[in-house]
Amino acid sequence: MDHIRNFSIIAHIDHGKSTLADRLIQFTGISDERTFKDQMLDNMDIERERGITIKSQAITLPYQAKDGKTYSLNLIDTPGHVDFSYEVSRALASCEGVLLLIDAAQGVQAQTVANLYLAMEHNLEIIPVINKIDLPSADVERVIEQIDDELGLDSEGHLKCSAKAGIGIQDILEAIVKRVPPPRGNPEAPLAALIFDAHYDPFRGTIIHCRIMEGTVKSGDTIRFMSNSATYRVEEVGHFLLQREKRNCLSAGEVGYIIAGVKTVSDVRTGDTITLDDRPCSQPLPGFREVKPVVFASIYPIASDDYDDLKAALEKYQLNDASFIYQKDSSAALGQGFRCGFLGLLHLEVVQERLEREYDQSIILSVPSVRYRFTLKDGSVVYVDNPAHYPGSSSIELSEEPYIRATLMLPERYLGAVMKLCMEKRGVNSTLNYPSPGRVELLYEMPLAEVIYDFYDRFKSVTQGYGSFDYELIDYRESQLVLLDILVNGERVDALSQIVHRDRARARGLQACERLKEEIPRQMFKIAIQGAIGGEIISRTTITPFRKDVIAKCYGGDISRKRKLLEKQKKGKKRMKMIGQVSIPQSAFLSVLKSDAD
């Protein structure tokens, strides 16, 4: 076990994590020029295109150090975006050390700090690495000061590198060997293995990614998942090189995979402990919490016949994404679908895109919402994340919404614009710090519902991309919440209902009405589109009808003839309006649902 090192790379989004992983893979020689491609560990197209890492990946790098010994370095690559911090915490629980990567030009960012605290919670050895030192705008001295002052780490032990140019890679590998402690654990003890990820293979079933903490597992063993006591027989174990590499056994300290013919996707829970059925460990491994979704939205198939296909796609998708939850839902306007929970807006976008690409689904997403808390007059407390379950306003004693504490780091010149944006989003209790000259750290408490709409995009645009943002949920606070309904031709469209703050209701209602007006085709009769709270109409637009020229055939003559024809047309239109159903096209739903996220 002395020759094993388990480490992870943590950084703010875009600080060069995946590029550094590529260089480490190249340097250790497991990838030649022919098989190499950028972002080796980002397997999904969407990860490559957006340049982000979404899923944790593991790979074993054989490295011959300067002391002449060969070490097995297990790299667990982690995502950097705020929505995926649960993936980071899972990966960190499987490691003994981390490389804390900091961009030499941008310096310490909000997510750097958040991930550092996660690493400290797990008591890991932290090696600060300053990346992109070859950039013209790199300011290494300033970053060293930030490591000392803002992060409270000893900057003496920092390393400098340029992952893109391949500078300083060997120093990093040597530092991992020297400074990251070897894993502890007893290969003879009862098996305890931590699941940090899993993915679905149509031929082999579920492939479990795990770190063996204690004991040994080999093919032929019968394993048990401790959270649900499901048992399976192990078919194959091994390490991840660029592909899966079969081994006879995995023992304490190693990172690898287990294939055990697990077909029921829901049995494999990320963060669960695997043990042997005939010789179980006494208690599960600590440190994992149930991941709680933060943003909720409904997903419907565009064609109602595709419901079963969508259900199968969600089941398979959920295996690769432990934090995604869903349950059945139905809507009068859109038919059968699913109510889903996500970690944040980027997570929601990624799920939507992966369902469309990898599983070939055509779907509609409803307006995203958060989980509100209502205390009713009879004293009971209900949590509502779906506007369809909104309790009647007459029965509500107290309505509350979730608040977050946002940490914003930005150059000082954008301070005014960012404070204005936060105030607009109902931000309160601001704290202002100056961690270093020219840089500001802002702390705000604000409603999560305001953040999930367009806060991130607007924050990025007012800071011209130089700001960074991180948040954590704090508590529920009293708020004036109302249910905004959209009526088309007097009929309530349930898929467009949303729970909003009373001050925002009129603007939201008007925005939805205007969007629908652009998308719904004109009919032969007038269509009213209204936004309503309870019985009160707060916004309205009208789609004017087509008009057939019924008096075209009358030349001159008596006006009463024309009047008679016009009256007849008016009666016909009235009758048409009473029985005429307005069909709302899919594009109209998408337009309204997108309007809040744009």
Curated annotation (Swiss-Prot):
HAMAP family referenced in this protein's UniProt entry, alphabetically: LepA (MF_00071)
Membrane topology category: Peripheral membrane protein
Organism from which the protein derives: Syntrophus aciditrophicus (strain SB)
Start and end residues of each tr-type G domain: 2-184
Family of this protein: Belongs to the TRAFAC class translation factor GTPase superfamily. Classic translation factor GTPase family. LepA subfamily.
Any Gene Ontology biological process: positive regulation of translation
Top EC class for this record: hydrolase
Protein name as annotated: Elongation factor 4
MF annotations from Gene Ontology: GTP binding; GTPase activity; ribosome binding; translation elongation factor activity
Enzyme Commission identifier(s): 3.6.5.n1
Cell compartment(s), UniProt: Cell inner membrane
